[in-house]
């Protein structure tokens, strides 16, 4: 019923799911994007998205939601996340999903330590090599709490700072809670960068 009610809203609707049956139902009800924390690895998910004109965001996660933060470890977090996402972008293209419909998300906070998250943010531009837009979601993340010592409700300034850094480092899509404040900050950044 919620998706039906949003059909007349003039903005894209993204549905977060890893299940092909939920994807199918959501897309049939008018969702225009699937956000999959498993990067369309589950059987049937590639085919469901490929059969539509919907966009998809492929996210990296080490482990599962229940285990991802127990012992995250990488030899080279940037190289490993990039290699995984490259493989998933290729799989999506091979399934018939056009590059114009694909975005990638390094999965900040999903099976990563604070230092892993910061290293990915520092090297976000490396993901431009994948040839699809990069999505960054730092808004109110626990990593920001570790840096600032503030609870989630008090992380607006930190969230905006992370969003601006992500944008400067190549992110073309930002997942945020505080849309107006982040938009204002991005407008200032754009005005400054226009004069460079």
What kind of region is each of these model predictions?
Residues 88-101:
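Phosphate/pyrophosphate-binding loops at sites that engage ATP/ADP/AMP, CoA/4′-phosphopantetheine
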